[in-house]
Amino acid sequence: VDEKTTDVTLENGDTQKTKWYQFRVPVRSGTPINGISDFNSIRFIRMFLTNFKMPVVLRFVEFDLVRGDWRRYTKTLDESINQIDLNDDELKDFEVGVVSIEQNEGSYIQPPGIERERLQGSTTVQLQNEQSVTLKVNELPANKARAIYKNISIDLRRFKKLKMFMHLQKNERALAINDDDFSAIIRLGTDLNDNYYQIELPLKVSSNGTSPIDIWPEANNLDAFLETFGAIKLERDQLDFSITDLYTSTAQDPEIMYTLSVKGNPTLAQLNTIVLGMKNNTSAPISGEVWFNELRSAGFDNKGGWAAIVNADANFADVAN
């Protein structure tokens, strides 16, 4: 997953470079041995490494069992495909992970303007780990997409904007990728398949710089106006477009870099799922990796409303009271 090189001073005063490797092993992708069927009773864990050509001394730092809230979305995002479940080969070409400021120091930098959360103790203040969820694809076929999802429960009716930082880079299997080779896909809805809003934003390749703006280029920042989400449903209904098909707006501002679509009847008052994905826009299989960070709502509408009770006594000449 990651590699870090450090300079170590030996006892004789010489300096030697040492490499540290971080591995993440997907537990549920293993091969059952001797009839084990589940993870309900795990008593021992053994780790071994093989295929070394010479004696090697390894220093083992820590072994952690970790989990995440994001899950791989095992269905296709292509609305034209009837068989929506991905097959075994398609499930092998993408994975979900995480990069953080503590475990990936040097290769990871927090987004501009974002500060690490502080845990206030009785005598000390501890900085929390700042991290991003990652989606990596390997030889993703042309015009195909892969995604991850998370279950939520939020109401965005009182907010004006939806924002997020994104980072695109080639992974270890990619020779090179270019700007707009990948698009980010963000879906928010009441369910994963039939009622959702979709945003698609072409991504620029992040540079190899060391500043936050290099790692998180402004062109990749999502800045969506939530008021247009309701407007696109009205636009679709006026055209008598089927609500069971994905409708893409044709009347949005041309200066807006993202494309907004809707399917079904989602509502910002009850969002239950978020889908984050990446789509191959080229005509050939390519590999890449996207980091998603700080998906957030902004611009809270705090304007008060009006309420009144009226009691009137009117006299209309000699006709009525």
Set out the residue ranges of the language-model regions:
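Extracellular/surface-associated beta-sandwich interaction domains
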Residues: 1-321
